[in-house]
Amino acid sequence: VGDITLYQTYFSTIVNQISSFINLLPIISKGLESVNSVGEVLLANDVENNKGKTKIKSVRGEFDFENLCFAYDSSKPVLNHLNLHVAAGETIALVGESGAGKSTVLNMVIGFNKPDSGRVLLDGVDMNTINLQTYRQHIAVVPQTSILFSGTIRDNITYGVKKISEQKLNQVIDAANLRSFIDGLPDGLDTVVGEHGGKLSGGQRQRISIARALMRDPDIIILDEATSALDSISEKEIQEALNNLTKDRTTFIVAHRLSTIKGADKIAVMRDGHCTEYGSYDELMALKGEFYEMRRLQL
């Protein structure tokens, strides 16, 4: 009887161990898949190969888009023999229907997309020959949806900037129309904004994004629908901040609210991947073409 009891105990122990191991198999399998995924990321080649390319220390901001063609899907080109010239320090607004190629042009300026044919010249140099890592140090982007971190206002404004002086920070706060807002907070610049800036309004978040761009003192500004989701009061405050940001800097703007681009030096109307009209706001309104009709529909 004792031997039988002993064997039963051994058997139960072995069965329990085997059962536990079987239950662990799915977890081990998922763990191995995760390890493989992490390994693929760590071992992957860089998306951009900047080795041997020209490092740039200064940028004037003159752009030439020469016979530019690009397609995400070979069956439908997004940019179709686009030709544009943007002078250094000039503000150009890109307008048109969704899918016209506006955001693709911005991605070309940043260097995220490479042309299938044609060239993008920066200060007369083909961007394919430029070290994009050094080039992007001269760019600031203000997107439609502000990207804030859960730290303080100070942290969000100065993020990525190595040398910070209180004088420069105060100048940026004034230029971004943040002074009255920050002075009204008990903790001022050290106020915690919450996850994704959840404790702030849309206009406040956007002005902090503009201040962050100003801190970088960029040569090239990219504004992607920076005022599209704001009320009229917030839009006015942000428009003033944007005017300070874009002064004497080459600026690319994508806008659907055409009233916000009256001050642009040039407006490019895009359709089917190429520029159909090009000129100042007053010139295009006098032309009474596509831009005129688009503006009339928004009145």
Language-model regions, residue ranges each:
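Membrane-water interface of transmembrane alpha-helices in multipass transporters/channels
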Residues: 1-9
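Conserved catalytic core of two-component sensor histidine kinases
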Residues: 8, 15, 136
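Cytosolic ends of transmembrane helices, especially the final helix of ABC transmembrane type-1 domains
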Residues: 13-41
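Short, hydrophobic secondary-structure boundary micro-motifs
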Residues: 22, 49-51, 193, 293-294
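An intracellular "coupling" helix at the cytosolic face of ABC transporter transmembrane type-1 domains
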Residues: 27-30, 47, 69-74
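Conserved E/DxxT/N motif and adjacent residues on the DHp alpha2 helix
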Residues: 40, 47, 158
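Pre-NBD coupling/linker segments of ABC/ABC-like ATPases
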Residues: 47-58
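ABC-type nucleotide-binding domain
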Residues: 56-299
